[in-house]
Amino acid sequence: MNICVNSLYRLSTPQFHSLYSEEVSDETLALLIGEVENGNQNCIDLLCNLALRNDNLGHKVEKLLFDLFSGKRSGSPDIDKKINQACLVLHQIANNDITKNNTEWKKLHAPSRLLYMAGSATTDLSKKIEIAHKIMGDQFAQTDQEQVGVENLWCGARMLSSDELAAATQGLAQESPLLSVNYPIGLIHPTTKENILSTQLLEKIAQSGLSHNEVFLVNTGDHWLLCLFYKLAEKIKCLIFNTYYDLNENTKQEIIEAAKIAGISENEDIDFIETNLQNNVPNGCGLFCYHTIQLLSNAGQNDPATTLREFAENFLTLSVEEQTLFNTQTRRQIYEYSLQ
């Protein structure tokens, strides 16, 4: 027994048995996690079983597995696929006649990181849709362009919805006191033709005033872009970060008119950074908005325009494989906020 446990899990027999007790020592957990990070499938299976627990340890382990799956935490090159398969096996067990009503398996019957990873792994479209329904419920598009159909949940070319983008960016804003991030909006109201960015700026100024770094996520109809108002040398500047083709002149003019409300009177104080970054990140405008906020929150006193211009230039130097990996991992990291 000792030899078997040690060869499979690199744990002593007492350490292995302790995994099924109420308290698991930090040392035992660290040993198991180390093996998981190295891609030990037996340990991955074991850790996924621990993640089923509905206590603090279960939630901690589930989060760690998702961090490895989403690339937030580094592991072996194929770690996400191994975690995927382990979660899929658990999902299949959770839905057999014996266990389907067992509360110990509830994380695989309700929105959770484990269920999301299982859905990512299955190639059965009907199962994928069934799992997506459990995760998303009945969602409705806020604009005609939003793709909220459950069959697209794991699609690598799916446009992010307002709610997904809001959940993720508000989560980032809570982690960074340097940024104020507003709920995503459309630029122009579809029926009244009202400039919604202007309205949101007026409301923000009336309620609390603009912060030193005020972020607005704006949808121009079928595309997300980031609009940042910030102070540089005591002067208010406006920065538009657009990761697709150049905006048309009407759209630019609507943004310029809105910027006047923030106190910007000269066009030289409005900077449009426009670079197509989506060749290998299809419909990735929302992903870049999210990542941009991450960059800005870590930029300190650096000029935001310089930070984002350098990011765009550097991103285009990445290989196709690296850009594709960015697409996959960022989508997973963003959706995690909707699972909390």
Swiss-Prot record:
Stored Pfam families: ElaD-SseL-like_C, ElaD_SseL-like_N
Principal EC category: hydrolase
Protein name (record): Deubiquitinase SseL
Main localization (coarse): secreted
A GO biological process held by the record: proteolysis
Signal sequence, start to end: none
Function noted in UniProt: Effector proteins function to alter host cell physiology and promote bacterial survival in host tissues. This protease targets the host cell ubiquitin pathway by acting as a deubiquitinase in infected host cells.
Organism (species): Salmonella paratyphi A (strain ATCC 9150 / SARB42)
